[in-house]
């Protein structure tokens, strides 16, 4: 029977399945951070259980670390306790930890791929909703809750029901300057923020194949923002070239054997999906969210929509509420909306290609008066590479703040946050009310678009910036 990529990955990991029971899956990789793991380790300790496979468990600190100092005390008592607990737990249970002083420390979904922890064909879990990022490699990756974190630590397995399948095909070639972030925001604009609920999404089409691995990670990272369980891109030569030579990747003949298997991880001809969505890449322009969920998104050259234009009463009410929170009036051009802060970072857009794109706009320009702009690399290696390329100097000379790695202003768990009423052009993944700080107003954009907003003081079309 013809199978989708998701069905192949799921079936390959079933340990046990009985009639009327949820299947038990084997988990190949478990990524751990300081926020969702303390209670899980406490549960192991209370029952006298070890970590079943410490060699398949990798930990880092990211959510509430300071981006200004490596001092564990910098972000308050709760953050300090969580980080100290992670140090203690990893030492006690034999788990590898990339702590604040480790050169590989960084956002968990940046660290995993760049160290070769993430590989095609794997099941990967983490107590974090954006674990879908790793699906870019053709891995089945999804976020889990703290009780499930404990279950995986104890058994290296997890009970999971089968999801529905969705194919999202982006046909044709994207125009110059259109990034993976624009593509995924356009997709969510079409599906809505709940359009993928109950599904695992496979992204395909020429525009997806054209993306680098970093672009594919941005794409899969935001699958969760359309309600999907996970996002997938089938592995190809782009994937294999990225993985080759990385720290935890197979070497020599083992790598060749792995690639032979990875090449089978494609949706079979004739396989059927429960839902199919199609977009034309050439129709996608730079995207900016205007509301309080990622599906409330328009082209940078559009006007703020009028709630009355929505036929669905639920959408209309949501738009009215969003505009009131965002302090926006219907009909005004998006390019006239001024911003207070810019955040370039997060597990969505903090990799080297993202920083290069932002630096290209920042080079030779200055951050607009009254705007605070932060650039937060996703990991120690990203920061080191950016500095080797001189990107930090470009940003600093333009008036951006060059920070240490961490999740930062994406979710405001450290000291990087918006004040009430402040408006931010952000490369992160969520624009919910209060996400970047109580009363803060978040607009999601690509790194180049964020840099353009920083130097102009308002939203601007990067295609017009020469």
UniProtKB/Swiss-Prot annotation:
- What keywords appear on the UniProt entry? 4Fe-4S, Amino-acid biosynthesis, Branched-chain amino acid biosynthesis, Iron, Iron-sulfur, Leucine biosynthesis, Lyase, Metal-binding
- The UniProt annotation places [4Fe-4S] cluster binding at 347, 407, 410
- Enumerate the Pfam families for this protein: Aconitase (PF00330)
Q: Which GO terms describe its molecular function?
A: 3-isopropylmalate dehydratase activity; 4 iron, 4 sulfur cluster binding; metal ion binding
GO annotations under biological process?
L-leucine biosynthetic process
Q: What is its EC number?
A: 4.2.1.33
* Cofactor or coenzyme needed: [4Fe-4S] cluster
Q: Does the keyword S-adenosyl-L-methionine apply?
A: no
CDD domains in the cross-refs? IPMI (cd01583)
Q: Its pathway?
A: Amino-acid biosynthesis; L-leucine biosynthesis; L-leucine from 3-methyl-2-oxobutanoate: step 2/4
Is the Chaperone keyword given for this protein? no
What does the sequence similarity comment in the record state about its family?
Answer: Belongs to the aconitase/IPM isomerase family. LeuC type 1 subfamily.
Give the matching NCBIfam families. leuC (TIGR00170), PRK05478.1 (NF004016), PRK12466.1 (NF009116)
What is said about its interaction partners and assembly?
Heterodimer of LeuC and LeuD.
Q: What is this protein's function?
A: Catalyzes the isomerization between 2-isopropylmalate and 3-isopropylmalate, via the formation of 2-isopropylmaleate.
HAMAP family registered for this protein in UniProt: LeuC_type1
Give the protein's recorded name: 3-isopropylmalate dehydratase large subunit
Organism field: Escherichia coli O17:K52:H18 (strain UMN026 / ExPEC)
Q: What is the lineage of its organism?
A: Bacteria, Pseudomonadati, Pseudomonadota, Gammaproteobacteria, Enterobacterales
């Amino acid at each position: 029977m013809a199978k989708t990529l998701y069905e192949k990955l799921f079936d390959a990991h079933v340990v046990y399945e009985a009639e009327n029971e949820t299947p038990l899956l084997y988990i190949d990789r478990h990524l751990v951070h300081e926020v969702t793991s303390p209670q899980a380790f406490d549960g192991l300790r209370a029952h006298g259980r070890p970590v079943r496979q410490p060699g398949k468990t990798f930990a880092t600190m990211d959510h509430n670390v300071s981006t200004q100092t490596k001092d564990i005390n910098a972000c308050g008592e709760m953050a300090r306790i969580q980080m100290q607990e992670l140090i203690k737990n990893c030492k006690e249970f034999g788990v590898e930890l990339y702590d604040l002083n480790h050169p590989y420390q960084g956002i968990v979904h940046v660290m995993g791929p760049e160290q070769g922890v993430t590989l095609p064909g794997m099941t990967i879990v983490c107590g974090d909703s954006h674990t879908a990022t790793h699906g870019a490699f053709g891995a089945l990756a999804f976020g889990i809750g703290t009780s499930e974190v404990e279950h995986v630590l104890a058994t290296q397995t997890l009970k999971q029901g089968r999801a529905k399948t969705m194919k999202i095909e982006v046909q044709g070639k994207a125009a110059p300057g259109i990034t993976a972030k624009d593509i995924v925001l356009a997709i969510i604009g079409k599906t809505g923020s709940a359009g993928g609920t109950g599904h695992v999404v496979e992204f395909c089409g020429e525009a997806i194949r054209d993306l680098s691995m970093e672009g594919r990670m941005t794409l899969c990272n935001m699958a969760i923002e359309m309600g999907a369980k996970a996002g997938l891109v089938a592995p190809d030569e782009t994937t294999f070239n990225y993985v080759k030579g990385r720290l935890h990747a197979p070497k020599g003949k083992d790598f060749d054997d792995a690639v032979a298997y990875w090449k089978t991880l494609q949706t079979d001809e004739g396989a059927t999906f429960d839902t199919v969505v199609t977009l034309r890449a050439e129709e996608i322009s730079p995207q900016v969210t205007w509301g309080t969920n990622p599906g409330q998104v328009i082209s940078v050259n559009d006007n703020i929509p009028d709630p009355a234009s929505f036929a669905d009463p639920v959408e209309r009410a949501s738009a009215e509420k969003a505009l009131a929170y965002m302090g926006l009036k219907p009909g005004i051009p998006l390019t006239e909306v001024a911003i207070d802060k810019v955040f370039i970072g997060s597990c969505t857009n903090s990799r080297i290609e993202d920083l290069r794109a932002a630096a290209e706009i920042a080079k030779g320009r200055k951050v607009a008066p009254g705007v605070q702009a932060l650039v937060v690399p996703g990991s120690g290696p990203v920061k080191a590479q950016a500095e080797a390329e001189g990107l930090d100097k470009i940003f600093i000379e333009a008036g951006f703040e060059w920070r240490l790695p961490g999740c930062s202003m994406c979710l405001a768990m450290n000291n990087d946050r918006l004040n009430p009423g402040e408006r931010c052009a952000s490369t992160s993944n969520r624009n919910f009310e209060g996400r970047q700080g109580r009363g803060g107003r978040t607009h999601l954009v690509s790194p180049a678009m964020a840099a353009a907003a920083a130097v102009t003081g308002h939203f601007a079309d990067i295609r017009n910036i020469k």
